[in-house]
Amino acid sequence: MDLLPFLLDANLSATNPPAIPHWWKRQPLIPNLLSQELKNYLKLNAKEKNVQIADQVIIDESAGEVVIGANTRICHGAVIQGPVVIGANCLIGNYAFIRPGTIISNGVKIGFATEIKNAVIEAEATIGPQCFIADSVVANQAYLGAQVRTSNHRLDEQPVSVRTPEGIIATGCDKLGCYIGKRSRLGVQVIILPGRIISPNTQLGPRVIVERNLPSGTYSLRQELIRTGD
């Protein structure tokens, strides 16, 4: 089950939805107002939740509730600032930082010292260590290697626009990340510029910078090694 359709503004649930979900038009995350279908899917109300929370985990609910699904493990040193929803059978790694507005689906793995802010992480996605994922969507079964960065702010401080099949959309958002399609695989230190879309089943080699929307395919940098000192 995809989370994003449950989180979009009501007017985006029409019979003819856009080809690319307008992920920046999410409703504010209020965990106790999620639909019962979504709560059941994420196993938020399971009778035996068996959630494992290690020592020195900080859960801050001063700005919103933090709800965790069954059989999820939160490792040593992680910080979670509500409102946040984490589904069932997830692993939140050591010193991960989960910031407000984030909703994480079932079976997700978050690596060491990764920071996630105001993002939707769909089922069975894997996000490696030391990543920064902000104002973005990571779709089902996507894999992000270490130190992947989603840029969410333009240097000229202008609102972020998104190029879609319907045309260029002025989102009005000062901060907006990217949409990473299902089963995409991103190598170490990939950087995605604000408002970009990566199509499903795309593979990006290490250190690729995503400056434009990418159709499905395999991409890598061309490298030239020069031997010197002889």
Swiss-Prot record:
GO terms for molecular function: acyltransferase activity; nucleotidyltransferase activity. The keyword Repeat applies. It holds the Pfam family Hexapep. The keyword Acyltransferase applies. It comes from the Bacteria. Its EC number is 2.3.1.-. Disulfide bonds: none annotated. This is Uncharacterized acetyltransferase YaiX. Belongs to the transferase hexapeptide repeat family. Keywords: Acyltransferase, Repeat, Transferase.
